[in-house]
Amino acid sequence: MIISHKYKFLFIGLPFSASSAISKELHLQYGGEPYLRKHSLYHEFENVATKSELEYFVFAVLRNPMEIAVTVYEKMKANTKGNFTNPELFSENGGHITKLHRERFNYIKDNNSSFQQYFKKFHKKPYDNLSSLTIDNCDFVIKYETIAEDYLLALKKAGVSNPKPLPVANKTAGKKNDLLSYYTNDIKEISIAVFGPFLKKYNYSFPEEWGVVKIPLKSKLEFLVLGVLRKLNQKYFKKTKSNISLDGTIYGDMQRN
């Protein structure tokens, strides 16, 4: 989370949605300061913000979850930065890599798993993420798919004149551009059940090649119920982790400067 008192804006950084690149640029160019944790949510900000800060312009990035699932798989498969094998990042040590993350990582590594095998094993419930706890509190939402244009528009709406383009950073190693190379016919129906409710809620579409799709009623109901439970858990039961990120990370270095 990045706050700028100069321009009176708050950026809520969501995982796998260019939060590092945007946070760094807001810090370097627009007086942005780290606030709480990298992926803190709006209700956490509300608990500590001043009355004037609650009036700040709020924005975040929304990304197609089909893309996010592929990105997560490729990051685990490559483990380029060693995140999934670094004990300092494990949740029991105050980090963000949970036991579930490590279970998925080990499954991919031990079985040389394809995306389709991984998806069948770990994606069984309707997909949801922190966007559902964030977007309703935003004054503007950047779509990841049009991030270059939307980023500039967000800054203009926040009162920045002549904002600079966002540098491209943090591309996922090994990731292919064609979604259909991942979402093959053998996981098409599962994908519709898993992603359908989220895509419909945020006006995303399945690949055109799939034609007209029907989202199962069971998935729609599960998505609604699990969404309510998720909000209650995040707001009232989830333990807050350390506000300080690791030294050597983009957010951690900003916090220490």
Regions found by a protein language model. Name each.
Residues 1-257:
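Membrane-interface amphipathic segments in extracytoplasmic regions
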